[in-house]
Amino acid sequence: MIFQRTVKEMVKTTGVGLHSGNKVTLIIKPAPVNTGIMLVRTDLSPAVEIPAVAEQVRETTMCTALVNDDGVRISTIEHLFAALAGLGIDNAIIEVDAPEIPIMDGSASPFVFLLQSVGIEEQAAAKKYIKITKPIRVEDGDKWAELKPFKGFRVDFAIDFNHPEIARSQQHMVMDFSSSAFVKDISRARTFGFMRDIEYLRANNLALGGSMENAVVLDEYRVLNPDGLRYEDEFVKHKILDAFGDLYVAGHAIVGEFCAYKTGHALNNQLVRAMLAQQDAWEIVSFEKEADAPVSFSVPSGAVFA
């Protein structure tokens, strides 16, 4: 049987909030079976819990943010959620003492390292998957995103940026996720931004924590980071990383193919909501025998079992 997973023990880190520029402490704790991912704002009294479900995503400008009915928010969840999805973690309590998850280095890699450092524990319940049985598609102008039936999890993703440095890189990628592909090929891809936008954001008290320490920064012609890129195709890979995290608010890993063109946080969330609303287009499945499971899901990507 493919079992549900959580972290073996509590793990803690500190970082900087991308938009506030303030120090943020993040704690990840084990959670019982069928908990899902629960976020907690510990800086509020009493502490406020926000479940990581699609309908709680109410802000998608520059990041994915969970917002409850009282307006309490936790922003920039997508890189942490990509790490949770990529390592197959179903259940966890995420405590944060600020309105945003720390940006770390702008990728999912620090979160992957953090989770692997304490180990991943299998739990005494079957892991549940959302198996796509019919295509679901959302569009916004020329942008679109779609989920289609597929045995496993495959991504077919294209970006289109009119920038000489990005145009030189690969802007279209198809990845059939094997047991190690996420950690090795995707998790280290950093968020990227343009100097002209950063100047505007800072003038509006946003991206105060943004720097070349946690983003790939471009001017009109080139990458400004002294060390350059981590992957030749880091731009499209980071958009895939974002999608990994955005899709995980569906509540379970997806068995299917995710195809997208120029999509972002807003359209990714629209797709998840459209999927959940179209109940004849998917089913919840588990795998009694490991041999029956799609290869992508037989072992969590790069996980270290304690």
UniProtKB/Swiss-Prot annotation:
Keyword flag Transmembrane helix: no
EC category name: hydrolase
Active site positions, chain numbering: 265 (proton donor)
One GO term describing the cellular component: membrane
Residues bound to Zn(2+): 79, 238, 242
The reaction(s) this protein catalyses: a UDP-3-O-[(3R)-3-hydroxyacyl]-N-acetyl-alpha-D-glucosamine + H2O = a UDP-3-O-[(3R)-3-hydroxyacyl]-alpha-D-glucosamine + acetate
Homology family: Belongs to the LpxC family.
HAMAP family linked to this entry: LpxC
Protein name from the UniProt record: UDP-3-O-acyl-N-acetylglucosamine deacetylase
Source organism: Shewanella piezotolerans (strain WP3 / JCM 13877)
The encoding gene: lpxC
